Structure formats: structure tokens, C-alpha cells
């Protein structure tokens, strides 16, 4: 089981890339009761509810003009999954990068239909 309680194939973490992250935090808090759980990196807000964290909200990167949600699918072995994705016709558009606080690693692929999807391998929780 992954750090956040996800297992292989689960749709887990979701991330909103938007033009105004702070305003989006306020909007979703008012709309559905999500709570801001912290800001582990400047401009990256973690949100959740009832003690659970399940997503992030951040500003678009320079040059990016398309606000969007990015789902992350949990995998047990990110390297093996990326290799398999490429063999099935996907392209890696963000190579593996470490999550803060030794949380694991993420990558983003573009599937054969052109859809960007995140993959995440979370580090195991210490008992």
C-alpha cells in the first residue's frame, strides 16, 4: 500500500493546475468543503478533508495556458510502468521526479490517444 493508502491502479492524487491557485483553494473550500492542509512548496497548496490529503492546487507553469485537472494513477514500480507505457505507444512527457518529504516519485505520460496522465509511486509508510 502506498504512502497515501493507494494501491496499484488506484486513481489517487489529483492536481489542479490553474491561473490563480489561491483563488481556486478558496473556491473549492466554499464549494465542497475541502480544507487547505499546507503549502509544502511555494505556490503549491495541498488539500483534503477529515484528516486525509488527496490533492494539490498550483499555478500554471510559465508558458502553459491551459488550466486542467491532472489525475495520478498509483503504481508499484514507476520505472517498470513507464517502460511498459512506452512499449504500448505512450510518451513520457515529464520524467520521474521526487516528491517532497521523501513521499515517492511521479511522472507524466501522454497516452496513445494524446491524453496526459500522471503516474505515482508512493513510498511506504513507516509503521
Q: What positions do the PLM features span?
A:
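Vicinal oxygen chelate
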Residues: 1-7, 11-19, 60-127
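Conserved short beta-strand elements that form part of the metal-binding/catalytic scaffold
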Residues: 32-68, 112, 116-121
Amino acid at each position: 500500500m502506498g504512502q497515501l493508502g493507494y494501491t496499484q491502479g488506484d486513481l489517487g492524487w489529483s492536481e489542479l493546475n490553474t491561473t490563480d491557485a489561491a483563488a481556486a483553494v478558496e473556491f473549492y473550500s466554499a464549494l465542497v468543503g475541502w480544507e487547505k492542509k499546507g503549502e509544502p512548496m511555494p505556490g503549491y497548496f495541498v488539500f483534503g478533508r477529515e484528516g486525509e490529503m488527496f490533492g494539490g492546487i498550483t499555478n500554471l507553469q510559465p508558458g502553459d495556458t491551459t488550466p486542467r485537472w491532472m489525475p495520478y494513477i498509483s503504481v508499484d514500480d514507476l520505472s517498470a510502468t513507464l517502460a511498459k507505457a512506452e512499449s504500448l505507444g505512450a510518451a513520457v512527457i515529464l520524467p520521474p521526479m521526487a516528491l517532497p518529504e521523501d513521499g515517492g516519485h511521479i511522472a507524466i505520460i501522454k497516452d496513445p490517444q494524446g491524453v496526459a496522465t500522471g503516474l505515482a509511486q508512493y513510498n511506504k509508510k513507516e509503521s
